[in-house]
């Protein structure tokens, strides 16, 4: 189901922001800008790329990250690369 997959990506991204990137997630929304609002820098992006690949099996490129302005954009970029499960499971 698309919703549960989306929710699972959202939950994992929240954990990555909190645990791996030391972001205070209480002040982060989907509309929060990654650099201006969340305060991510190049080191945080590198840590995030590794954590996303480790936890979700999704390899984002530097180009993918540069196209993301907000947390919601990042979530959508991850979601687009998450393999969809077979409908028959």
Curated annotation (Swiss-Prot):
Residues 7-82 form the Carrier domain. Acyl carrier protein involved in the formation of acyl-S-ACP intermediates within the mycobactin biosynthesis process. The gene is mbtL. This is Acyl carrier protein MbtL. The keyword Phosphoprotein applies. The modification O-(pantetheine 4'-phosphoryl)serine is found at residue 42. Pathway: Siderophore biosynthesis; mycobactin biosynthesis. 4'-phosphopantetheine is transferred from CoA to a specific serine of apo-ACP, leading to the activated holo-ACP form. Its main location: cytoplasm. It holds the Pfam family PP-binding.
